[in-house]
Amino acid sequence: MNLHEYQAKELLRVAGVPIPPGEIATTPEQAEAIAKKLGTAVMVKAQVHAGGRGKAGGVKFCPTPEAAKEKATAILGMTIKDLTVEKVLVTVAADIASEAYVGIIVDRATKKPVFMVSAAGGIDIEEVAATTPEKILYHPVDTRYGLLPFEAMRMGFFLYQDVKLARQAAKIMQQLYTAFMSAGCSIAEINPLVVTPQNELIAVDGKMVIDDNELDRLPQIAALRDESSEAPSEVDARNANLTFIKLDGNVGCVVNGAGLAMATMDLVKYYGGDPANFLDIGGSSNPEKVVNALRIITADPNVKCILFNIFGGITRTDDVANGIVTATKANPLKVPIVIRLTGTNEELALQILKENGFSASSDMDSAVQRAVELATKGGAA
């Protein structure tokens, strides 16, 4: 679950991280009033779950309250990566002497949180990792002990030679770690961490991604979800208990099991196609899941072909076949469908599909190739 910048900053503030004052506005008049209240130059920042807000025109410097109103008028209602901006953060504009990056991710190999720190802040850390990896220090944290003071100081001195700044940075890293753990994050970052002309550190921007598996035990964090800033298809899928991530391709994928779903997407790319989504119907033998999956995928106008890839274990292939038949009878497909299934009750599934005008294959490679071919032709058989 993604948090907005203002939500992430509030969690950081509670943990003790120094944050510029700011408030949320949903109208230009509110933005102007907040700027007057802050009494200094401000930044007006679009609050949507999308990167590249600045490049899209969603982050503006405003020297006066009148400018804040003007920029908020332009930003509110604008679309950034298919998401409509409904609120802006009006925050004090920081004087910047230098910028650094401090972040924490989860390393799935070591099963530990890992700090990433770099003096090259203010830009995407992925870009730094690709072009100048020596500028990044990685530091895993043993969760039995947490981030120890000497570890934090080591990272602080990696960023700053000045002892005062290194100590400030070390303290902020410990506070960031506290926020990361208490909110159930998979990602938490401050970018940039700014040195002001007064030689003080302040977190100008913050990002947090919450592990969905943590939400049941953290209802106060789950309450921060903003479905209006999520893709409608992902909200629909979550309500239908489907694991779904929307992508930009044209091959709609319906698969059971996360591993097979990722392998299917890899094969689609291998054969020259682009997957339109990641969709895992899970191990349930519930035809309704297939009905919901088809409904969600067919709502995407970019999808030119639908690919089913089912390996029947716990999932019975005849239930999947019945789901396909039920869904297509209720809403006839406007794009071709390619079905690959094998495993539990395979013969019965093939019979059900054949009786209803569908053909299916047990070979994954040929099915994926056919789906890519059809999608490339724009859905024409």
Curated annotation (Swiss-Prot):
Catalytic activity: succinate + ATP + CoA = succinyl-CoA + ADP + phosphate; GTP + succinate + CoA = succinyl-CoA + GDP + phosphate
Gene Ontology BP, a term: succinyl-CoA metabolic process
SUPFAM superfamilies according to UniProt: Glutathione synthetase ATP-binding domain-like, Succinyl-CoA synthetase domains
Recorded GO CC terms: cytosol; succinate-CoA ligase complex
Binding-site list for substrate: N256, G313, I314, T315
Pfam families linked: ATP-grasp_2, Ligase_CoA
Sequence positions that bind Mg(2+): N191, D205
The ATP-grasp domain, residue ranges: 9-236
EC number: 6.2.1.5
Primary enzyme class: ligase
Cofactor mode of binding and number, as noted: Binds 1 Mg(2+) ion per subunit.
Signal peptide positions on this chain: none
List of residues binding ATP: K45, G52, R53, G54, A94, E99
One term of GO molecular function: ATP binding
Pathways per UniProt: Carbohydrate metabolism; tricarboxylic acid cycle; succinate from succinyl-CoA (ligase route): step 1/1
Keywords linked to the UniProt accession: ATP-binding, Ligase, Magnesium, Metal-binding, Nucleotide-binding, Tricarboxylic acid cycle
Complexes and interactors: Heterotetramer of two alpha and two beta subunits.
Primary role: Succinyl-CoA synthetase functions in the citric acid cycle (TCA), coupling the hydrolysis of succinyl-CoA to the synthesis of either ATP or GTP and thus represents the only step of substrate-level phosphorylation in the TCA. The beta subunit provides nucleotide specificity of the enzyme and binds the substrate succinate, while the binding sites for coenzyme A and phosphate are found in the alpha subunit.
Recorded family membership: Belongs to the succinate/malate CoA ligase beta subunit family.
Protein name: Succinate--CoA ligase [ADP-forming] subunit beta
Organism: Gemmatimonas aurantiaca (strain DSM 14586 / JCM 11422 / NBRC 100505 / T-27)
